[in-house]
């Protein structure tokens, strides 16, 4: 029972190995190029595990035809020699035209580069000429101070003359100007008044006048009070018939009258009138 099973396993393994080898050969044939290149030498295949004694079968030949060996000899389109000559002529003319265009482009590029180089050279020459002229100007003349800048003797542009303002011709403008002048004008009395306000002597005099007025007012009040008291006494004396009280009453009336006059007049006049009395 054991021997037949072992024989069956060996036959199955040999058939599977042969199928694998065929598939590998087909893949290699499909992968190799078919345009006349020689096939690379195949490396020695390593025997798989368990198949050391078995040998791989030889690969089958490829059924694909090679280009160098078919009947048409590369003329797959089956063209005539005249057609091939015509196509070659057209291709040559096309190549010649493209080459000519490239040469013309190169010529124009070279001409443009030469023109740019020429312009740069001219610009450098002009700059050098300007520098030489500036150096000559600096050498001419002398410097008055070490801070003086050379070449500053050129005439500067004269400033534009300012236009004179023409006086207004209409009467309305003249009236407006007169009104403005009146508003801006200041009289001499206003100036003197402002200066007197800020003068300290004037302030002291005003304070003295106020004090004198207060004193005169107090004196007048006292005289009025005395006069009222005398009137009351006179009334009482007239009732009693006393002549002395009537004389004293007259004197007090005179004093009260003088006090009233002094309170009504300004303190400067009162001070001037006191020595006369």
Swiss-Prot record:
Keyword Nucleus found: yes
Motif (Nucleolar localization signal (NLS)): 249-256
Biased composition (Basic and acidic residues): 63-72, 115-142
InterPro entries in the cross-refs: CUSTOS (IPR026694)
Residues recorded as bearing Phosphothreonine in the entry: 80
Biased composition (Basic residues): 248-258
Taxonomic superkingdom: Eukaryota
Single GO BP term: negative regulation of Wnt signaling pathway
Entry's localization field: Nucleus envelope
Ranges in a coiled coil: 106-141
A Pfam family annotated for this UniProt entry: CUSTOS
Annotated stretches, region: Disordered: 1-81, 108-182, 238-277
Compositionally biased intervals (Low complexity): 9-18, 265-277
Any one GO cellular component localisation term in the record: nuclear envelope
Modified residues (Phosphoserine): 62, 158, 238
Keyword annotations: Coiled coil, Developmental protein, Nucleus, Phosphoprotein, Wnt signaling pathway
Function, in words: Plays a role in the regulation of Wnt signaling pathway during early development.
PANTHER family xref list: CHROMOSOME 12 ORF 43 HOMOLOG, PROTEIN CUSTOS
Family (UniProt): Belongs to the CUSTOS family.
Descriptive protein name: Protein CUSTOS
Organism: Rattus norvegicus (Rat)
